[in-house]
Amino acid sequence: MSIKKSILFFLVSFFSFSQSYFLEVGANETEYNYTNENNVSLETLEASSGLSFKVGMSDLFFETDEISHSIGASIQSFNATGGRGTGMDGTGLTQVDSYEWNTTFVGIFNELSIPILNKGISVAINSGIDLSVLLDGKQKISNAIFDLNDSDDFKGVFQTSKVGLSIKINESIEFGYSIMYSSGLKNIGKGDDAFNMKTNQVSLKIIK
């Protein structure tokens, strides 16, 4: 069974047993750490924005006052831009050297939340793991567009590790900030020579 079919099966099973659930929307700002096939790092890459959507359930398997557990499904956009823009070479011709990545990943997540303050509002430390695959992606180099599904850097399962803080202002509304690191499972342990992503995320969670 492919991971995309597994996610669909997970969602159907998830809502069959769900009694309380949440919807989380967020904004991502992602930086790529990218080395091309010639082992040259692209120093001109810049962070770019994207969106995040999650649906999940808390405390499905266990519930304590000291820790909260959440599982669910996610859709994430990890994007980047770069290049030196437009200029003139020695022949007087205009040279365009620009890059743009637009991606959509779909996956499942597993998170823990540990409260550190609970006086009127609740503040918690959050950590978690997201396993995802590229659903759709395009790379634009100057005026040429390439399908990232054909790129070895984006094939396979990606692992995203997360750590952050959240503020729950009432039983239904929670705001969060997280730092996330994403890498293909095949690249874990290879250091800076492998393609990876760092993302800053702000989010709003609506709890049912």
How should each PLM-predicted stretch be described?
Residues 19-62, 199-201, 205-208:
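Short glycine/proline- and aromatic-enriched beta-strand/turn motifs that initiate or cap beta-hairpins
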